Amino acid sequence: MTDILTNMFTIVAELPLGEEEGFAFNGNILETNLINLAAVIGLLFYSGRSFLTNLLRNREDNILKSIRDADERYKEATEKLQQAKNEFEQAKIEADEIRAQSRITAKEIEVSLMGLVSEDTKRLIDMKQATISFEEEKAINEVRRQVIRLALQRALEQSKNRLNHRLQKRVTRLNIGLLGQLVGVND
């Protein structure tokens, strides 16, 4: 600041003196209103100091309030960020627990389904075996019936050819005697 004032006074001192036309330095204090200017500047300085002081104080208060508000917002944002980080970590832990539980549940379901499939397979095999056995027995019984029927037909044909009247009476008596013995035994 002092350099600026020194430069200004140097420029003013080098200006030509006198009453020439144009711009020149007038050394007469009364003509230049230097006293009036000094009084106005002094009055401005005296009355403007309180105004400037109040203005600067208000500005300082506003700046300090803005800084405090910014600090409070920073603290709130930091707290919210920390809370969000904590919630995120908690969510990650819960997600990991859910994943682990779902893996366990999937394994349990897999084992259960494998057991059910095994049981169903065993039951189907047993049913197949029972069906095969039933069909085999049915086929065997059918074959037996056919064999017996054919044997009886052949026996009847042979007996018709071989039996005469006398032989038939003898067989009939023998059968009646056997039946009589059976009836006597059962009594």
From Swiss-Prot:
It is a single-pass membrane protein. One of its GO terms (cellular component) is chloroplast thylakoid membrane. The chain crosses the membrane at residues 34-56. Keywords: ATP synthesis, CF(0), Chloroplast, Hydrogen ion transport, Ion transport, Membrane, Plastid, Thylakoid, Transmembrane, Transmembrane helix, Transport. GO terms for molecular function: proton-transporting ATP synthase activity, rotational mechanism. Disulfide bonds: none annotated. It comes from the Eukaryota. CDD domains: ATP-synt_Fo_b. Belongs to the ATPase B chain family. In plastids the F-type ATPase is also known as CF(1)CF(0). F-type ATPases have 2 components, F(1) - the catalytic core - and F(0) - the membrane proton channel. F(1) has five subunits: alpha(3), beta(3), gamma(1), delta(1), epsilon(1). F(0) has four main subunits: a(1), b(1), b'(1) and c(10-14). The alpha and beta chains form an alternating ring which encloses part of the gamma chain. F(1) is attached to F(0) by a central stalk formed by the gamma and epsilon chains, while a peripheral stalk is formed by the delta, b and b' chains. F(1)F(0) ATP synthase produces ATP from ADP in the presence of a proton or sodium gradient. F-type ATPases consist of two structural domains, F(1) containing the extramembraneous catalytic core and F(0) containing the membrane proton channel, linked together by a central stalk and a peripheral stalk. During catalysis, ATP synthesis in the catalytic domain of F(1) is coupled via a rotary mechanism of the central stalk subunits to proton translocation. This is ATP synthase subunit b, chloroplastic. It comes from Chlorokybus atmophyticus. The gene is atpF.
